[in-house]
Design a protein with these regions (language model features):
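Conserved thiamine diphosphate
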Residues: 112, 124-130, 181-219, 263-292
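Cofactor-binding active-site loop characterized by glycine-rich and histidine/acidic residues
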Residues: 1-163, 168-170, 174-192, 197
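Conserved acidic/glycine
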Residues: 1-7, 241-463
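Short glycine-enriched loops at secondary-structure junctions
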Residues: 177, 181-184, 237-240, 444-450, ...
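Short acidic, glycine/serine/threonine-rich loops at helix termini
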Residues: 10, 32-37, 144-148, 166, ...
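Glycine-rich beta-alpha junction loops
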Residues: 28, 167-169, 209, 235-242, ...
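Active-site nucleophile and cofactor-binding loops and adjacent substrate-binding regions
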Residues: 1-4, 24-26, 60, 78-99, ...
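Phosphate/diphosphate-binding loops
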Residues: 209-234, 283-285, 336-340, 504
């Protein structure tokens, strides 16, 4: 988030309880500003601490800055989404945060426009007033799925705010090689709503202009929340003071003039000047805040690292105790000491180093029996089981709602079964599903003509266009629409018309 802090603070101030953020890996300022992320959690994720008490966002399974609200409780039941701001798990596949944001916003539309969902909305919506914010860097707006979702949002008129952090580069590639007219807001100008029809509200604002940023997000949030007008907030003149990543400094590809401008025009520098010029604070107070922040950050970093290493150290010490017992009972130092020495040479061992040492020790003492070897084998088995829980559990639901626990219902046939087309069976099955208010179907040609294969024939007339909904040819945003809506307690059925379309 370096160089994008101020716009993220302004965005956060426009959010309300029940809103959603579907962002990417530069949004830590938003997470902290809305109270969804603490600095101890930030550093715990940096070190990959596989304990949700330290890293509740991912339990050490995601890269740093991939923040996520916990949507389910320990029993696999939904938590109340209306009483907090909700963060969808951050993602590194650039633009992939956008399709699911479309679905989250679409759920607000359904909760507002379908009274039959009222009793199901308790944990998910208060009258459909929730806005979904989604963020992206300027270079990633070139991804096809981004354009697809922009178009879908304009068609659907859903409460979504697209934010673009524009620092003029995609790693080393400048914007003139990325975006038509070197500006995503200019390139998308045809989507601007006007007397010709509905569309998006497009707002351009500078990354260092705090009053302008506040006004932009207040305006966008009001339009999205009250009128269901999708908005694009294009934040220009962002900086990237640390370069794109650890792969190299931005000094490799930015001109001397550009580097000098970034030093002077960084949002934090100009924000500080604005505070002082308007006498909201003084230099000594701001310096005290700076100094305290550095001390606090270093403390949280050290504490997080110590907490992570202590979790490893418990198993490391257990291994060393067993190794000593093994040495005492076998008197074979030549077999064991090289393994221990190799482990001790690892400055900061992780769990895989312990597994590696344990397996090497078992192989070295494969011809020995006795309590010490059995204890080592049990320790290794237990450690591998714990590691499976740490790193591989909950890939699918482990609650009572697991699909693997659904009991099979075998078909029953009459003595002389009636022969009907398969599409008729599917049609009746879909009709049965749609009796559940949470279920809806969307896809290409599913509505008016009832699907190209007639499996949905007559169902739009029976249940209405918000239950069986025609869409454009836009596969990735359809999938995202389903994913996002399902995260808000709904049960979408998304049709990708033909199997080969999934390649899109």
């Amino acid at each position: 988030g370096d160089g994008k802090e101020l716009c993220q603070i302004a965005l956060a101030r426009s959010m309300q309880t029940g809103d959603y953020i579907s962002g990417y890996y530069r949004d830590q300022t938003i997470g902290v500003a809305v109270g969804d992320l603490t600095w101890p959690q930030y550093f715990a994720q940096l070190y990959g601490h596989p304990d949700i008490n330290f890293d509740p966002h991912s339990g050490g399974r995601q890269m740093n800055n991939h923040h996520a609200t916990r949507w389910l409780d320990e029993h696999g039941e939904w938590k109340d989404q209306t009483s907090r701001i909700n963060s969808v798990a951050g993602i590194s596949s650039t633009a992939a945060q956008t399709p699911r944001a479309l679905g989250i916003a679409y759920a607000s539309k359904l909760y507002r426009e379908r009274p039959d969902l009222t009793e199901h909305a308790t944990l998910f919506s208060k009258g459909g007033q929730e806005v979904c914010y989604t963020t992206i860097g300027d270079a990633s707006t070139s991804e096809g799925m981004y354009f697809e979702c922009i178009n879908a949002a304009g068609v659907l008129q859903v409460p979504i705010i697209f934010s673009v952090w524009d620092d003029g580069y995609g790693i080393s590639v400048p914007i003139e090689f990325q975006t038509t007219k070197s500006s995503i807001s200019k390139a998308l100008a045809g989507f601007q709503r006007n007397e010709d029809g509905k569309g998006l509200e497009i707002i351009e604002v500078k990354a260092w202009d705090y009053p302008g940023l506040l006004a932009a997000y207040v305006r966008a949030a009001k339009l999205a929340r009250e009128e269901f007008v999708p908005c694009l907030v294009h934040v220009i003149e962002c900086t990237q003071p640390q370069g794109h990543s650890a792969s190299g400094s931005h000094e490799r590809y930015k001109s001397t003039d550009r580097l000098a401008w970034e030093h002077e025009a960084d949002c934090n520098v100009l924000f500080r000047q604005w505070i002082l010029e308007n006498k909201y604070s003084d230099e000594s107070t701001l310096k005290a805040i700076d100094d305290a922040a550095i001390i606090e950050a270093r403390k949280h970093q050290k504490d997080a690292f110590a907490a992570y290493m202590s979790s490893v150290d418990v198993d490391r010490k257990a291994y060393l105790r067993i190794a000593k017992n093994l040495l005492d009972s076998t008197n074979e130092p030549s077999l064991l000491e090289p393994i221990i020495e190799e482990l001790n040479q690892v400055s900061y061992p992780i769990f895989s180093d312990l597994v590696k040492a344990g397996r090497k020790t078992l192989r070295a003492f494969r011809f020995y029996q006795g309590p010490a070897v059995k204890l080592l084998r049990k320790w290794l088995t237990d450690l591998e089981d714990k590691n499976r829980r740490r790193f591989s559990s909950h890939q699918m639901s482990e609650s009572v709602h697991s699909p693997l626990l659904v009991k099979e219902v075998k078909p029953l046939y009459e003595k002389v079964p009636q022969q009907v087309d398969g599409r008729e069976i599917l049609n009746q099955s879909f009709s049965n599903f749609l009796e559940d208010p949470r279920v809806f179907i969307l896809g290409e040609d599913v509505g008016k003509i009832g699907d190209v294969n007639q499996t949905l024939a007559g169902l739009q007339d029976k249940f209405g266009p918000l239950k069986v909904t025609d869409t454009g040819i836009r596969e990735i945003s359809l999938v995202g629409q389903g994913v996002g809506a399902s995260m808000r307690g709904l049960k979408p059925i998304v049709e990708i018309q033909y199997l080969d379309y999934i390649l899109y």
